[in-house]
Design a protein with these regions (language model features):
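Alpha-helical transmembrane segments of multi-pass membrane proteins
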Residues: 112-124, 150-163, 188-207, 381-384, ...
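Juxtamembrane and boundary regions of transmembrane helices in multi-pass small-molecule transporters
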Residues: 24, 166-279, 474-526
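Hydrophobic alpha-helical transmembrane segments of multi-pass integral membrane proteins
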Residues: 110-141, 145, 379-392, 408-444
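Short helix-coil transition sites and intra-membrane helix breaks within transmembrane domains
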Residues: 75-77, 88-95, 125-135, 163-171, ...
Length: 526
């Protein structure tokens, strides 16, 4: 009964967005209200609330869960979304987006390669460095600028922002996953490397299938060519990511793998792509290129310098100007680093880049204000969704859903293990949050199934428990595609507010294929 009640918010959200075609902000807000009511009147009687909160007031527990959710939504998710779109709007205001568009089309006039370069290569690079929606918002906005339709731009950006998310924000999701199941609370480098490699193996077929889907959505008439490009780019991506994961850990697969994909796509375009029908191809001076790309170059520099790849700077930023808000009843403290978050890095990068592009500080602030006003519905959507996830977590709903799946599937559990991770990401919008919620559950089930020794998985030897734990992030990356939070980011970036349901409906078939293939890889690898 607890599992059935717990799944009501997820089902309701789908029904409102797909069945009633209700706008995303209205669907999310109404679902939050229903979730709060379930937490208040059903969670305790059904015994869903965790033992550590069993003696707490349900009203206080639920209220503070909503507060925590809103804090998490604003700091840093909404700030990052705002700054990502602000960075694009600066390019529009300075008209440098026209230079970038001409540069992309000077590489090749093959639309499929352009789209793949943006959403798979550039998008993966953004995910690896920053995460938190930048890899959906920025490529989608650039595609719109290149003349692609909003719905198409949103869909391919969501499909592209999947396999890289497990290693997004310099590997935070997989590192968190391993720390959650480590006995000491801090995973060894060997465990992180093994789990990273396992996740990439489980995702291997999707490194080829997803580029093929993206290419085919762009051009349905050249399937053989699409397959060849997908094999070329996909194999290079997965091999480079596997080597990085196996030898270096979780920090570099998305970054280096995406750079390899970018090089592979450009190489193919230069060698094999059809020649442009235009006799004269525009060339650009170094100064012109640096000016046009200054916003994104500064984003790359700021995020790399402030991130985990530069430990001294990262440690300094994380230890200074950190606000802490104690959350009674939840026994937790919400912390936000004012100078260490990706949102500030995006703001500084975009503003400095805008100045380089000739905009005054006053004009930049006008662009920022206009961007903020245009995102008002997105604010409601994101706050409602993250608060909803927090309420479901503290009321025990998410654990009840997972436990129900374990009870039903038994020995076939590895087949649905990625679905657990996908549910976590669908609800929370975050691969990292999904791993926090379900890492211990996956490890516990592995022990129940006797998966405690060593084995060989598609040619790689390692721990059976790590294989099943890795399945959580494998599924979580697929759930990212249809997470209402990701959908909200796509609608904002493509100026499609109110059409969340249409985007969700178009993405669901690809997400289901993703999760099913992930489940088959996990199951047959056992």
């Amino acid at each position: 009964m607890a599992s059935i009640v717990s799944i009501i918010p997820i089902v309701l959200l789908f029904i409102l967005m797909l069945g009633f075609k209700m706008a995303g902000h209205k669907s999310a807000l109404l679902t939050l209200v229903v979730t709060v009511l379930l937490a208040l009147f059903a969670a305790s009687p059904l015994g869903m609330i965790a033992p550590e909160h069993a003696e707490d007031s349900v009203i206080a527990l639920t209220g503070w869960a909503v507060v925590e959710g809103i804090l998490k939504a604003v700091f840093p998710i909404l700030i990052i979304i705002l700054m990502a779109i602000y960075s694009y709007n600066i390019l529009v205001e300075s008209k440098q987006i026209e230079v970038i568009k001409r540069q992309f089309t000077s590489i090749t006039d093959d639309k499929g390669l352009l789209v793949l370069l943006l959403v798979w290569g550039f998008g993966g690079l953004l995910e690896g460095m920053a995460g938190f929606g930048t890899a959906v918002a920025i490529p989608a906005a650039i595609l719109i600028g290149l003349g692609f339709k909003p719905m198409f731009s949103a869909l391919v950006s969501l499909i592209g922002n999947t396999v890289a998310t497990g290693f997004g924000a310099v590997g935070v999701p997989v590192t968190t996953l391993c720390n959650e199941v480590a006995e000491s609370g801090s995973a060894s480098a060997a465990q992180i490397c093994e789990t990273s490699a396992f996740a990439i193996i489980q995702l291997a077929p999707l490194f080829i299938i997803l580029p093929f889907i993206i290419l085919t959505l762009t051009d349905k008439h050249n399937l053989i060519k699409n397959l060849i490009i997908a094999l070329w780019v996909g194999v290079i991506s997965v091999v480079v990511q596997f080597v990085c994961g196996y030898y270096l850990g979780s920090e570099t697969p998305a970054i280096i793998g995406s750079l390899a994909a970018i090089i592979a796509i450009i190489a193919y375009a230069k060698v094999f792509a059809r020649k442009s029908k235009v006799q004269y191809k525009e060339t650009f001076t170094l100064a012109e290129s640096l000016k046009a790309w200054s916003v994104y170059l500064f984003i790359l520099i700021f995020i790399l310098v402030s991130g985990a790849l530069c430990p001294p700077v990262n440690a300094f930023l994380k230890s200074h100007l950190v606000s802490a808000v104690h959350l009674p009843v939840l026994d937790s403290t919400f912390k936000f680093g004012w100078i260490s978050n990706a949102g500030l890095m995006l703001f500084l990068s975009a503003t400095i880049g805008g100045l380089v592009q000739g905009l005054s500080l006053k004009r930049l602030m006008v662009v920022l204000a206009r961007t903020t006003v245009n995102l008002r519905k997105t604010v409601v959507t994101i706050c409602s969704l993250i608060a909803l996830a927090s309420v479901m977590n503290y009321s025990g709903m998410i654990t009840s859903i997972a436990s129900g799946l374990v009870a039903v599937t038994g020995d076939f559990y590895p087949l649905v293990a990625p679905m657990i991770g996908a549910i976590g990401t669908f609800v929370t919008g975050s691969d990292t949050s999904s791993n926090i919620l379900f890492a211990k559950l996956q490890a516990h089930v592995a022990n129940q199934l006797g998966m405690t020794g060593q084995s060989t998985f598609f040619g790689m030897e390692g721990g059976q428990e790590n294989w099943l734990v890795a399945a959580n992030t494998t599924g979580a990356t697929g759930g990212k595609m249809i997470s209402p939070q990701s959908i909200a980011i796509a609608t904002a970036a493509c100026d499609m507010e109110g059409k969340d349901g249409e985007i969700l409906r178009s993405a669901i078939p690809y997400a289901l294929l993703y999760i099913v293939l992930g489940g088959l890889m996990v199951y047959f690898g056992c």
